[in-house]
C-alpha cells in the first residue's frame, strides 16, 4: 500500500508522522506486510496523488500549536477535493524540534539560511538574529529539501530536524532546539477517499464559502451548531485566490457526521443559503488531541 508524504526524503516531519501512524496501524491490525512511503514536493502534490489514486493515503501537516493552521494544506484540500474528492480519515501528532545545522562546523557564518516557511516562523527569534548578522533567509518546499541542499554547500545553513542531520550528514551547531517555544507539536491529517468509522470520540470538518454581502453570515453559520450544543474546535479563514476579501472557512467540530445534532445543523445551514458554493464535508475521524 502506497502512502504519500512531504519529501524529498525521510528527513521531513511528514515522513515521521507517516511512519508513526502507519506503524501503529500495522501493529493494531496485525499486518505482516509494510507500507511503501512515497515522497512528494509539496502538500498539493500529496493531495493530488490521493485524489487521483496514485497512493492510497496521504499525510499532510494541518496545524502547529505555536504557528497555527498550515494555510498551504487547507488550500490544497480545497483545490483537490473539488476535482477528485478527498476525506480526512485520521490525525496524528508529532513533537517538533528544530535545529541549526551546516555541512561543516567551521565557526563561520553561512551566506544564507534556508528552510520551510513554517519552520522559519517557529524559530523567528533565531532567524532575526541571523538576519541582523547579514545572513540571507530563503524559503524551500520542505525542511528535508532544505537539508538536502545544505548537504552539498558549506555556505548554506538550514533549520531542520535532528533526523535530517543524520540522513543528510549535517553538523548540528546548537545542541538545543532553536524554536521560539519548547514543547512544539504539529498535527497531521491522514487523507484518503473515505472517512473513518465512528469511535464515539470524533471530529468532523467542513469547508464553506460564506456570502459576504449578507449581514451576520458567519454568526448565523456558527449559530446552527451552537444551538445544538456542538463544540466548535477550529474556525480558519483561507483567502480565495483571485477573489479579494473572500474566504473559504475550515470548520472543525466535535462529533461524527451521522450524529443527529450534526445532521440537523448541517441541514439547517444548507437551507439558510449563506454559502456561495455548495458547502463540503471533508471528513470525520478519531479525535486524538482533545482532553
Can you describe what each PLM-predicted range is?
Residues 1-291:
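Domain-level signature for soluble enzymes in the chorismate/prephenate branch of the shikimate pathway
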Amino acid at each position: 500500500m502506497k502512502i504519500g508524504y512531504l519529501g524529498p526524503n525521510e528527513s521531513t516531519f511528514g515522513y515521521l508522522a507517516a511512519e508513526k501512524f502507519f506503524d501503529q496501524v500495522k501493529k493494531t491490525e496485525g499486518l505482516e506486510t509494510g507500507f511503501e512511503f512515497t515522497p512528494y514536493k509539496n502538500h498539493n502534490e500529496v493531495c493530488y496523488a490521493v485524489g487521483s489514486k496514485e497512493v492510497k493515503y496521504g499525510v499532510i501537516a494541518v496545524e502547529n500549536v505555536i504557528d497555527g493552521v498550515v494555510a498551504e494544506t487547507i488550500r490544497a484540500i480545497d483545490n483537490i477535493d473539488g476535482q477528485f474528492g478527498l476525506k480526512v480519515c485520521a490525525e496524528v501528532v508529532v513533537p517538533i524540534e528544530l535545529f541549526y545545522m551546516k555541512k561543516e562546523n567551521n565557526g563561520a557564518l553561512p551566506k544564507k539560511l534556508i528552510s520551510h516557511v513554517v519552520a522559519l516562523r517557529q524559530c523567528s527569534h533565531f532567524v532575526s538574529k541571523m538576519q541582523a548578522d547579514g545572513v540571507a533567509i530563503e524559503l524551500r518546499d520542505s525542511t528535508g529539501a532544505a537539508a538536502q541542499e545544505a548537504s552539498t554547500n558549506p555556505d548554506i545553513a538550514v533549520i531542520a530536524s535532528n533526523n535530517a542531520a543524520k540522513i543528510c550528514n549535517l553538523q548540528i551547531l546548537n545542541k538545543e532546539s532553536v524554536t521560539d517555544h519548547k514543547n512544539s507539536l504539529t498535527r497531521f491529517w491522514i487523507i484518503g477517499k473515505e472517512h473513518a468509522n465512528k469511535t464515539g470520540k470524533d471530529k468532523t470538518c467542513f469547508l464553506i464559502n460564506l456570502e459576504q454581502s449578507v449581514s451576520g453570515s458567519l454568526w448565523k453559520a456558527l449559530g446552527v451548531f451552537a444551538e445544538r450544543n456542538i463544540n466548535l474546535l477550529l474556525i480558519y479563514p483561507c483567502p480565495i485566490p483571485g477573489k479579494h476579501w473572500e474566504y473559504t472557512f475550515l470548520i472543525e467540530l466535535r462529533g461524527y457526521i451521522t450524529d443527529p445534532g450534526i445532521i440537523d445543523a448541517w441541514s439547517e445551514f444548507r437551507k439558510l443559503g449563506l454559502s456561495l458554493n455548495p458547502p463540503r464535508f471533508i471528513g470525520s475521524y478519531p479525535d486524538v488531541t482533545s482532553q
